[in-house]
Amino acid sequence: MVVLAAVAAGAAQPALERYQILPEASEARYRVGETFLGEGRFNVAVGRTRDVRGVILVDRQRPARSRVGPIVVDLSTLQSDSARRDNAIRQRWLESTRFPEARFVSTEVRGAPSRYRDGQPVELEVVGDLTVRGVTRRVVWKATVRLAGPELLAQAATSVRMTDFGFQPPSILGFVRAEDDVTLELDLVARRESP
């Protein structure tokens, strides 16, 4: 899940607002191109799950102090339009029995406004560490975030390479071959916790 960790906050600074991600209203996805070799046909495979947990900490007075993470996604629950693909990904590539979770923790928020007004969509970059299969790499998410009353709405995307996380792109017996580049997407709805 996403847990935003507070940065050194002195007594004079306002408290960070804590938003808990709502899995039933949120979704994590991957998109990866795959080529069916015998047919020369290209397809974009999409896998998704609602098993997304985490917290986001928001500083309305100084938005750049806001933090995300850890956000945790249960990889074993990813589903696409092909059960065969899903099983192969779980067993051979993501190995989600051994490594069931992907985890992201932010280190920096870039492009945040100096002040925030409720309802205002904000485009920013969230930099941090993504861990998949026990391998951690620095990634940059491009995000649009909006606070609407007690809820935080966010859409974010980043691109990674499978080989950067220690596994080769899926290739099944000359039938289908996936690209190395994968787009990761998050649609998050989080609710502010009572102080």
Cite the ranges covered by each PLM segment.
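Hydrophobic h-region of N-terminal signal peptides that target proteins for export
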Residues: V2-A12
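Low-complexity, acidic/polar, glycine-enriched regions of mature
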Residues: A11-P195
